[in-house]
Amino acid sequence: MEAVPEKKKKVAAALGTLKKKKVPAVPETLKKKRRNFAELKVKRLRKKFALKTLRKARRKLIYEKAKHYHKEYRQMYRTEIRMARMARKAGNFYVPAEPKLAFVIRIRGINGVSPKVRKVLQLLRLRQIFNGTFVKLNKASVNMLRIVEPYIAWGYPNLKSVNELIYKRGYGKINKKRIALTDNSLVARSLGKFGIICMEDLIHEIYTVGKRFKEANNFLWPFKLSSPRGGMKKKTTHFVEGGDAGNREDQINRLIRRMN
């Protein structure tokens, strides 16, 4: 019976020694490391939240812009229809406004051509066969197109053609490299300072030939189109004579469909 109190005494003594032992202090370097890690984590979370908020705001802005542009395009189309109806009702002909935008496709090589033609093709950025570019129409550009007319097919693209070309074949010139336009951020990074932050902005600027057309068009790499389905008829003959070269006005849209 005396063994039990003896056992209790031993346990009590062991507990006493444990209480007397001091817990080793956490080193200052470890404390500092933990504190820095906690601060870094807070900063990272704040940055992540700020970026998320910014992306959300930008997505909303892009959606609103796309909606506005869609309304604008529809209004332009309805105005054209209304004007044509009014003219027809009055027994007149409606003459639409002069086109401001052209799409130019190179259809021939330049073997044995004059240096002047070669230079104009370089200015139009048509360095390879089946390359295509947008051109703002004015007196100077029309004269350039006339010089190289036997080597190009050109006309007036509609909204659908501009849309499909940029979305399907669109590449941007970023740091002198040809980069596929797979994200709005690529457009915003290069053209954000001009108020062009998304693909819809880019399409609108090109189609309407806006104030920043030059910057938007120079950002776009020349389009590399496929050989037209069904082939070409006669490259050396003008379109009005049954060939492929020269101005085909709104019929360029059919050629774009065959090559896109």
From Swiss-Prot:
Pfam families: Ribosomal_L30, Ribosomal_L30_N. The gene is Rpl7. The modification Phosphotyrosine is found at Y151. Residues 7-66 are annotated as: 5 X 12 AA tandem repeats. It comes from the Eukaryota. Component of the large ribosomal subunit. Homodimer. Interacts with DHX33. GO terms for cellular component: A band; cytoplasm; cytosolic large ribosomal subunit; cytosolic ribosome; postsynaptic density; ribonucleoprotein complex; ribosome; synapse. Belongs to the universal ribosomal protein uL30 family. One of its GO terms (biological process) is rRNA processing. Component of the large ribosomal subunit. The ribosome is a large ribonucleoprotein complex responsible for the synthesis of proteins in the cell. Binds to G-rich structures in 28S rRNA and in mRNAs. Plays a regulatory role in the translation apparatus; inhibits cell-free translation of mRNAs. The modification N6-acetyllysine is found at K136. Sequence repeats lie at residues 7-18, 19-30, 31-42, 43-54, 55-66. This is Large ribosomal subunit protein uL30. Its main location: cytoplasm. It is found in: Cytoplasm. One of its GO terms (molecular function) is DNA binding.
